Amino acid sequence: MPLRSSQSSPPASQSFKRKQPTISSFFTKKPPTSQEKAQEPEDEPAASRRQFANALDKATRVKEHGAPAERDEEQEEEEEDIVAPAPKRIKTNGVHEKEPASAAKEVSSASRPAPPLASSQRTELYKFASSPADGAGAGVDRPEDPETKQRQAERERLHQLFVKKLGGADCAVGIGRSAGGDAPSGAEEAAEGDEDEEVAPAPAAKGRGSKKAGGGKLTPLEKQVIEIKRKHMDTVLVIEVGYKYRFFGEDARIAAKELSIVCIPGKMRFDEHPSEAHLDRFASASIPVHRLHVHVKRLVAAGYKVGVVRQLETAALKAAGDNRNAPFSRKLTNLYTKGTYVDDVEGLEGPTPAASGGASPATGYLLCITETNAKGWGNDERVHVGIVAVQPNTGDIIYDDFEDGFMRSEVETRLLHIAPCELVIVGELSKATEKLVQHLSGSKLNTFGDKVRVERVGKKKTAVAESHSHVANFYASKLKAASVDDTQTSNLLQKVLTLPEQVTVCLSAMIEHMTEYGLEHIFQLTKYFQHFSSRSHMLLNANTLVSLEIYQNQTDHSTKGSLFWTLDRTQTRFGQRLLRKWVGRPLLDKSRLEERVNAVEELKNPEKTVQVERLKRLLGRIKSDLEKNLIRIYYGKCTRPELLTVLQTLQTIAQEYADVKSPEDNGFASPVLGEAVASLPTILKDVVAFLNKINMHAARSDDKYEFFRESEETDEISEHKLGIASVEHELEEHRAVAAGILKWPKVVYVTSSGIEYLIEVENTSNAIKRVPASWVKVSGTKKLSRFHTPEVIQLLRQRDQHKEALAAACDKAFAALLAEIAVNYQLFRDCVQALATLDCLLSLAAIASQPGYVKPEYTDHTCICVEQGRHPMVEQLLLDSYVPNDTDLDTDQTRALLVTGPNMGGKSSYVRQVALIAIMGQIGSYVPARSAKLGMLDAVFTRMGAFDNMLAGESTFMVELSETADILKQATPRSLVILDELGRGTSTHDGVAIAQAVLDYMVRTIRSLTLFITHYQHLSNMTQSFPDHELRNVHMRFTESGAGQDEEITFLYEVGEGVAHRSYGLNVARLANLPAPLLDVAKLKSAELEEQIRRRRLARLLTAVGEVMSDPAKGDEDFLERLMSTAEQL
């Protein structure tokens, strides 16, 4: 009970009483001096003083930090009494206002004045230099107190009572707790109360039995959070608490940073670290329930692993259960990373970027990689690598097993092709591979235009045996079921079980990894296992993808200006993904290639306009990503409106061609088109059967209770619906009972602020006097009051329990429906794949319809014969017309071109144009040319550009030669090789020697089709060593005008025969706006060097002519050819 002053002197002013504790609370406790210790009363026990000081300290902290903003006058009065000035407290001798009568009488009978005190008990503990009380009694000796032992004992007892009452409900701490809000005791408010009691930012020492000074007792929610967090320390946890999702500790800091939300300060760690002992709660941040997936997507896109912890109980069912007084049960129900986020049909991609030339669309692959050191070391090092890549959004699985050299070009090629958003590394990687992975997944944006998330998994010495056992057990049940009636599935499963060792290790790790996210079912789709290195496709290595700008341009790494951007005219997301695969994996099978290009030709044919427009209209009506929708149904993560949309879309597709019974009935001559169209109506029967179970309007509005048609509802759903109807009927009958009690026949139920079945009674009517005391007043106004009767409260509780059970039954039935649809996943997926094929073919047909595109002619002979060919991307980006050029390469005739010409003359664009036309042709597309005859190339290799590899400690020239060495090892007579200015990274003599040796090896030994760009005019003499013209000199044509200072160069961008003997680098320097004086000096130096070289050549020519004149026997045919060549150079 609060202390009251019993003195006769006038009380201190209200302002003084309030300022005193506030000022002193800002200063730490000052230890008493020896003089002060001597002045302390000897008759008061030291334990009592310490308890009194601790109690005052707690009260002061509560007033500073924990007192609510709004307090009534009584609360303020009580707190003011607690912290009243000490001199006035001394005169009361520490006696409560409501003391026993004897004590009060004893105090009142004491007529002598209290002796003056140098410092009271409070000012002795909290000194403030400017306090008038401190100086009032300074230097005054306190006389001995003549109190009796009985009075001392009574005083001690009263101090103990005060300390005990400080933590009671009616003290300042209790007032702060009640104002802050305690947990509601009603069952209906359990969810809200759990949040208020456990999570609200409580000040120190707030709450009964939960003194958290120095990290004391934890609330039940905090215990739950710590228990879950310790099992998932690498995960950002989003925890459902009442009607919000909350972050705690370090997770709250991350959420505040990434989501731009408020973080309430507190503990960041979960290990009770001493550095946070002064904090009494965890840092926290919160988001609304309906915005969960919006914020989860942002965290996942930022590279975090996010876990969602949900409440497994509802308020109504918890109130009716046996654990109504325990906290809500919570469990980690969902885990998400960039590669495993499938809970939103759009995933992390957002709108289609390719159409606007934005960033390259993410493939969404998770790639698992492991390696062992095969043999060798240094530059001869060979490693054995296994990979498994999974795309959870579509169900595709890619695997490969290969050896790689010290440059790791094979690993880089696969990483660039697959473009994973997440890597799982099994075991330790070699330094070279580790550096490559770091380069592609570093903190900065990588070549994919995104950050790659990396997880590492340990690898035991017995990993191979354990992995094989794990994979075998995973597929055991499926293999047993398939062996009876499905030979194809059995063969596919046997193929999976006989994968190479490194692939099996990766597959086992990926199964375990995906199980953590509940997506392990994807590996049961064995039909979609694909080998990366299938020889049915052209090989485009990492350098080729970058140099030829297959997926991204080299300027800003967006899709605009890439080959994929040029060919992409698709209308659907799944069609766009398939086209991306086509672009990166051109065909090698001539028959398949001819089928595809014939299909494009038929779609381009004006006679097929009706059929083509019908297909375009059908694709235009597909607004959802069916491939992702189907895999979400397979995972059981599809929503009700989404399921309705998918089934209705599939029904539209099937009904459009319901009249097609066979591939010959669809109006297309091409077998590719015929089979694709004929597969569309095969799903109609199943789709209609599923749609007949669904209430369309309820599904569209996401009404789980009416989702199924009445005839399709389960017994459990019907039972709870009848229970709800019964309760509502009883509520209606009870209205008449309430009317009889009030003797007012017009009683009706009303709903106010979401609270149903309220009985309104006017405050001025006679009925208000007849309201029983058992009725609960819920709300009211000046004119009326609203009540719940005890019967209504009980019936509403029963109805809520039925509603909760009904919701669970509806979710269970919906999950069963999704599982039933998932049985037909492969049938539906094949239909969507057929539609994607049609979309890609229509896209290629749109390209073929552009002016200047021609259908290529394919031959088994290795050659590239193009007349008036053009660069496909530059042509679309340029406003002016592109200058076409001819190309004639044949493995039996001229198989190499030595390309020279001035800087900026178009050499690199020309060789890229040749490579891109060859790739487009093997994709099955028309090519930008007047005519084209193409052989089946097995690979395109490029060595272009100049850059170093600082991570690997390799110089520009080292990188250049290492890439060249890889090309020489991999190239075949059916490959196209492009080498751009090889040897420029070293001295002229060494560069010429290396370039000449490599070119000779390519032409004579490997016999690949080769385009070799150089500024070394000396290499042009190599053509003389190839009498059958296997190597030819060509140059980029230009015209010169003016002389000296006024010399100008005009680039014609045409390929001509012969050699360009000058590079005209000074022209580029002038275009780059180098200072004029610098250009003048450069021109003089260039002229001097050219004159020196010309004089040397002339001197050698004159010497040779003199020798011939003196000895005619030396003038053989070879000598005369060299003589003529020297004269031409002059």
UniProtKB/Swiss-Prot annotation:
Chain segments carrying region Mispair-binding domain: 212-339
Cellular compartments annotated: Nucleus
Tagged with keyword Ligase: no
GO MF annotation: an example: ATP binding
GO annotation terms (biological process): mismatch repair; mitotic recombination
Key words, A-Z: ATP-binding, DNA damage, DNA repair, DNA-binding, Nucleotide-binding, Nucleus
Keyword DNA damage included in the entry's annotation: yes
Region annotation (Disordered) ranges: 1-153, 177-217
A single Gene Ontology CC term: nucleus
Basic and acidic residues biased stretches: 58-70, 141-153
Binding-site positions, ATP: 901-908
Sequence ranges of Polar residues compositional bias: 21-36
Pfam family, one: MutS_II
Low complexity bias locations: 1-15, 108-120
Acidic residues bias (residue ranges): 71-82, 189-199
Primary location recorded for the protein, binned into one broad class: nucleus
Protein's job: Component of the post-replicative DNA mismatch repair system (MMR). Heterodimerizes with msh2 to form MutS beta, which binds to DNA mismatches thereby initiating DNA repair. Msh3 provides substrate-binding and substrate specificity to the complex. When bound, the MutS beta heterodimer bends the DNA helix and shields approximately 20 base pairs. Acts mainly to repair insertion-deletion loops (IDLs) from 2 to 13 nucleotides in size, but can also repair base-base and single insertion-deletion mismatches that occur during replication.
Family designation: Belongs to the DNA mismatch repair MutS family. MSH3 subfamily.
NCBIfam families: PRK05399.1 (NF003810)
Subunit annotation: Heterodimer consisting of msh2-msh3 (MutS beta). Forms a ternary complex with MutL alpha (mlh1-pms1).
Protein name: DNA mismatch repair protein msh3
Organism this protein belongs to: Aspergillus clavatus (strain ATCC 1007 / CBS 513.65 / DSM 816 / NCTC 3887 / NRRL 1 / QM 1276 / 107)
Gene this chain is encoded by: msh3
